[in-house]
Amino acid sequence: MNTTTETKPQLYLYHISQKIRRGYDTFDSAVVCAESEEEAQRTHPSYLVGPGDSWEDEYTWAKCPAEVSVRCIGTAAPHIDKGVICSSFDAG
C-alpha cells in the first residue's frame, strides 16, 4: 500500500498583458494559472510556455517575457491546472 501523499503546490491566477505588439491578429492579455509571477510572465497566451526564446518570431505577443506585465488576481482552486485559463485575441 502506497501511503505517500503528493502535495500539489499552491497555484495563483495572474492577469498578463502586453502593449508592444498591437493591432489585428495579436493577443493583448490573458488569465493564466501559475506557481509564480515569473512563471506567469513566461506563459504565452497561445499556450507556449518556456524561456521566451521561441517568442522572437512569434508576432502575436510580446517579443520576450520582460515585455509582459503581470498582476496577481487571486489563488487558484485546487482542481485548476497550470496554464492559460482564457486569452484575448484581437482577430483581424
Predicted regions and their residues:
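A structural detector for beta-sheet-dominated domains
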Residues: 17, 35, 71-73
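Short aromatic-glycine-(Arg/Gly/Cys) micro-motifs in beta-strand/loop hairpins
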Residues: 4-25
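A short, structured loop/turn motif at beta-sheet edges
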Residues: 6-8, 33-40
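Short, mixed-charge low-complexity intrinsically disordered segments
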Residues: 46-92
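Glycine- and charge-rich intrinsically disordered segments
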Residues: 1
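His-enriched metal-coordination microenvironments in redox/metal-binding proteins
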Residues: 22-27, 90-92
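A short, exposed loop/beta-hairpin motif centered on an aromatic-Gly-Thr core
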Residues: 25-35
